[in-house]
Design a protein with these regions (language model features):
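Structural scaffold elements adjacent to functional motifs in cytosolic proteins
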Residues: 65-67
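Short, surface-exposed ligand- or partner-binding patches at beta-edge/loop junctions that are enriched
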Residues: 106-107
Length: 145
């Protein structure tokens, strides 16, 4: 009987370990949006701040970081390389944003970025990501234009 209990314990431990690994792998996977981009890469719905920092350090022409806060807030400090398109004016300026460009949208805490992302979707944009708020940016901000 003791042998059976040990076997069940070992099997339970193995199953628990496999389940834990599965959850970790699933959590690390991102859901993708849009079609293949440069070199077959696609824009995910979520990237870590460190990944965005790498993008800032090595900008790609087909990926724009869009700040939808007020121009005043943008001037006071924004993610380097971000372009200012305040939420109140972005929809009237869509002619400036190529529809096939990947867009990473952020605001102060995330609410306005979510709203703008939904508007972009309605306008036909498929390659966008609501990054949330500037508070997630841990590094030095750029000021001015």
């Amino acid at each position: 009987m003791n042998s059976n209990k040990k076997q069940i314990s070992h099997i339970s431990l193995i199953l628990l370990s496999l389940f834990t690994i599965f959850i970790q792998v699933a959590a690390a996977q991102s859901v993708y949006v849009g079609k293949s981009g440069p070199e077959g890469k696609v824009l995910r719905k979520y990237i870590e701040p460190a990944e965005l920092k790498k993008l800032v350090e090595n900008p790609v022409d087909t990926i724009w970081i869009i700040d939808v806060r007020s121009e005043k807030a943008y001037l006071e400090g924004h993610i380097p390389t971000a372009k200012s398109y305040p939420s109140g004016t972005i929809m009237s300026r869509l002619n400036e944003i190529p529809i096939d460009t990947y867009l990473i949208i952020y605001c102060t805490v995330g609410g306005m970025a979510r709203i703008v992302s939904k508007k972009l979707k309605k306008a036909g944009y498929k390659r966008y990501m609501d990054w949330g708020g500037l508070s997630r940016w841990e590094w030095e901000k750029e000021t001015g234009f």
